Design a protein with these regions (language model features):
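Histidine-centered catalytic micro-motifs
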Residues: 162-167, 198-206
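Short acidic, glycine-rich surface-loop motifs adjacent to enzyme active sites
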Residues: 41, 45-46, 151-171
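Binuclear metal-dependent phosphoesterase catalytic core
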Residues: 206-308
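N-terminal active-site segment of His-dependent metallophosphoesterases
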Residues: 1-55
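Active-site glycine-centered loops adjacent to acidic/histidine catalytic or metal-binding residues
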Residues: 8, 43-44, 77-78, 165, ...
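Hydrophobic beta-strand anchors of alpha/beta hydrolase catalytic cores
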Residues: 3, 39, 109, 160-161
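Extended active-site neighborhood of metal-dependent phosphoesterases/phosphodiesterases
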Residues: 51-151, 179-195, 209-246, 255-260
């Protein structure tokens, strides 16, 4: 079976460059051409609220994706609920809950949600940007959700693909990721390849790693790389139109992947792009590598891997 996946589109006209209707159409047309059974994103799809875009435009963008003639699915990222209440986002995204699963052509896709802060022993979901107040407490997966994942994997009679915004593989990923990895290893000992692949977005990086017999795919942003220290080399007139342009390295194309699953063989067909005006992170006052030692690239790599 084959599906299309992208991440971190960051639709916010006038704030970010990229994440446009044209980008969405590009992803859709490639999915149609490749025969993808569905399209899914790994979070940070759209920024709502008046500070980003009028409600009607924000909702229209979401509905454009929802109403494609290929099934579409959402996964929550940290920014999806920055300016729109969680309950409203779930309604607009047509999600049954913050976590859910579906089966497609012999595989189970499990969308889980580590968008929680752990504060005084309580797991508090991200909502209206609350996590900005407690950054050290973010990126936790509640134990109840780990148990839900265990049950959903145990009940599957097929390989499972796990998708979330934050990472189970990166050292700067989900805080209690080892508990989840231990659970995955337990399930794979009981039933080989119970969990075949784990996909995350969020970090705007491109990396593939096999960890304990599971393929972990750190999926790049479809739109840009974020830089903390602004770059002052963009044209002034563009910066006046796109507020956070100086804080981004823009990709010229909506990079994403089409993934084919055949038994335990995973084929990732990525794509290469380039950066707007040829501007790279090395031209700015920002470190070239991130906390996991990964460079920014305007690319989603391609690979064919059989897990044994």
């Amino acid at each position: 079976m084959k599906f299309s996946i992208f991440s971190d589109l960051h639709y916010a006209p006038g704030v970010f460059d990229g994440g446009t209707y044209e980008d969405l159409d590009f992803i859709y047309k490639r999915a149609k051409k490749e025969g993808s059974s569905f399209i899914i994103h790994a979070g940070d799809f759209a920024h709502g609220g008046d500070v980003y875009s009028p409600d009607d435009d924000y909702e229209n963008f979401i509905n454009t994706y929802n109403n494609l003639d290929i099934p579409t699915y959402h996964c929550l990222g940290n920014h999806d609920t920055d300016n729109v209440p969680l309950e409203k986002v779930l309604e607009l995204y047509k999600m049954p809950d913050v976590h859910y699963f579906f089966d497609c052509e012999g595989y189970r896709f499990i969308i889980y949600d580590p968008n929680y802060c752990l504060i005084d022993g309580e797991y508090v979901h991200y909502d209206m940007g609350n996590y900005f107040k407690t950054p050290e407490a973010r990126d936790w997966l509640p134990p109840s959700q780990i148990e839900w994942m265990r049950k959903v994997i145990e009940e599957a009679n097929c390989p499972c693909i796990l998708i979330s915004h934050a990472s189970l593989e990166r050292p700067d990923g989900i805080k209690n990721r080892q508990s989840v990895l231990d659970m995955i290893n337990e399930q794979n000992k009981k039933r080989p390849h119970a969990v075949l692949m784990v996909i995350n977005g969020h970090y705007h990086r491109d990396n593939i790693r096999i960890l304990d017999g599971v393929l972990h795919f750190d999926l790049n942003s479809a739109s840009f790389d974020w830089i903390g220290k602004p770059y002052n080399g963009y044209p002034k007139e563009l910066c006046e139109k796109i507020r956070l342009l100086p804080n981004t390295i823009i990709y010229n194309d909506p990079i994403h992947a089409v993934i084919t699953l055949e038994g335990t063989t995973i084929t990732i067909e990525g794509m290469k792009s380039s950066t707007f005006m040829g501007i790279g992170r090395e031209m700015t006052e920002n470190p070239y590598y991130d906390e996991a030692g990964r460079p920014v690239t305007a690319e989603v790599q391609s690979a064919k891997i059989t897990l044994h």
